[in-house]
């Protein structure tokens, strides 16, 4: 297999779904473009209605949560449900901590540089203390915290929603994925479409809490229901012409979801795009299409991995350009934003990888004082 071919097509050694990894990057780029809107006029903002791009990540996370539960069931774990739930959330949260700590430091530095003249000493202290709530994932609980990085709400909302959903899904099994999850998803999505809060403001407070947290519950439940659909779909054989047709439907469907982010501002349309995204994710995970065959190379998986640092660190460039207020054409500021976001994300990922390797080779040792 040539090196060029290996970038896109592998020998199947990687167990991850390459199409999903590619889509992680695509929807992450959609979020990055959405957040560049502060540089543009209202009419020319890129993907200005793309707030529902985050729902893709929620849906995938819901699917993978049920997949983890199925593995736990087959392993016949003997730990209590509470401990198992905590272990699952720890497995989700701990790998994110280096990223959250680093972006927290970036945020403190940038905000302090640009707003320190307007803060008293006591204000600076309160600013730091309340910002810790964001680092600890408490932002979407309703606690008023100092927001240093606007896009981190997604992680807080996901962990909060998973805390009750995981034990419910583990305890109830198919009753959850086939009945409770889809019912909860459609009712919450219907409620979101009727409430006054907009998707563009996930921190907006509603009668059910932050709208972002409600979105997390809805989309995670939708992802749980997707798992049930995939299970049912995989039980049947399919002919080549049908697989080819579904491959076209898959790619066209995702193109429609992305294109709608630019043109459809009505919340009802956004809700329908969330349903379409869930259907497409089910199609992608089902393996019916041929996409996985030519989306399984090293480049695809590298893009999937890079989506995490890009999502977390790109907001730093948005804040920087907002504060600097450069007297430059919009196109140049946009180029600086994109280039800076890529550079900061790549550099931060390199720093985190270096620290992980360093601490692996030089683990911290706690000295037992009783032996001294």
Which residues are covered by each model-predicted region?
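Localized chelating/binding microdomains
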Residues: 129, 133, 217, 221-224
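Residue-level recognition of alpha-helix termini/interfacial anchor residues
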Residues: 176, 216, 229, 238-241, ...
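Alpha-helical transmembrane segments of multi-pass integral membrane proteins
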Residues: 220, 224, 247-357
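Membrane-cytosol interface segments of multi-pass membrane proteins
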Residues: 1-195, 301, 306-309, 324-372
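Short juxtamembrane and helix-loop transition motifs at transmembrane-helix boundaries
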Residues: 110-120, 137-147, 200-205, 229-241, ...
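Signature aromatic-anchored transmembrane alpha helix within multi-pass, membrane-resident enzymes
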Residues: 180-187, 239-257
